[in-house]
Amino acid sequence: MYSDIPAGLALAFVIIGLWVLAWSADRFVGGAEAISRALGVPPFVIGMVVIGFGTSAPELAVSALSGIGGHSNLSLGNAYGSNIFNIAAILGVAALIHPIPVRPIVVFGAVPMLLAASVASCLLVCLGDGFSRMDGVWCLALFAVLLPLYCYLDGIGKCDADASSGEAASCRHPYLALFGGLALLIASSHFLVWGAVDLARALGVSELLIGLTIIAAGTSLPELASAIASARRGQHDFVLGNIIGSNFFNALAVVGTSGAISPFKDVSPHIFTRDLPIMVLLTLSIAVFGLNFRKPLSQGTIPRCCGGVWVCAFLAYLFLLIRQEALPA
C-alpha cells in the first residue's frame, strides 16, 4: 500500500504536509461556517455530515486498501485508533484551547447513538470467527438507519444552536473553500502518513502498532486541524460535530465497507481486550464531561481540566501500546 521512499523525501513530505494541512484547515472550516449561515443549517449538522464525514475520507481509503491487501489488523487499527485519537487527543486539545459548550441534545441524543454504533461495531468484530462480509453489510445498514436520526435530533435542538456561534464568517467563495480545503486536507494527510509509515517500517514495528498510532493519527490529522481551526473561530458545534460524525463514520461505514470488501481474519486479541473497551469508555466520557449535573437539561461545558484528562489518557494509552506491542509474541 505504501512504497519505500528516501528519508530525505519523507521528511520533505512531512514538512510540506504540515504547512498545507494548517492552511487548508482554516479555509475548510471558514467555508463550512459560511455555508451553514447562508443555508440556515445548524452548525452541528454541518460539522457532523460535511466536516466529520469529509475528514474521515482518509480513514475509509486506508482501511479499504488495507482490507483488500489482507491486512486486517492494520484496517481495524486505523478505524478504532482514529476514534480513540479523535476523542482523547483532538477533543482534548480543543478543550484546552477553549472550553467546549455542549448542548443537551448532544449529551442525550448524539452521544448515546454514537455509543450504540461503537458497541454494535465491537460486538460484530468480537463475536464469531472473524468479521464476515455479512457483518460489514450489517454495519453499513446500521449506519444508514442512524444517520437520519442524528440530523433529526439536531433539528429538535436547533433553537439553541446559536448559543455556540462565534464571529461572523467572511468567505468570498465558500464552496470552493470547503471542497478545495477538504481535498488539500486529505492530500496533505497522505503526505504525512506516507513518510511516517516509511520511517516506522525502518524501525521494524508491528502492523497493529502502525495502524493504531501512525496511520490512525495521520489519517486523523484533517480532524485535528479542523478542530483547532474551529476552536479558534469559536465554532464549538463544528468541533463536536466533526468528532462525533467522524467516529460514527469510522465505527460503522469504514469498518463495514472494509469488511464487506474483504472479511477480516486473524484479528489481534489486543483489539478485543484493549482498544475496543477504551474506545467505548472514551465515547461515554463525552457525555459525562459535557453534562450539566446541576441542570441536566441545560447547556453544559467541557472544561479545560477535562481536556487535560483526555490528553493524559491518550499519552497513557500510547505508552501502553508501545509497551505491549514491543513485547515478543
How does the language model describe each region?
Residues 1-329:
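Hydrophobic alpha-helical segments, chiefly the membrane-spanning helices
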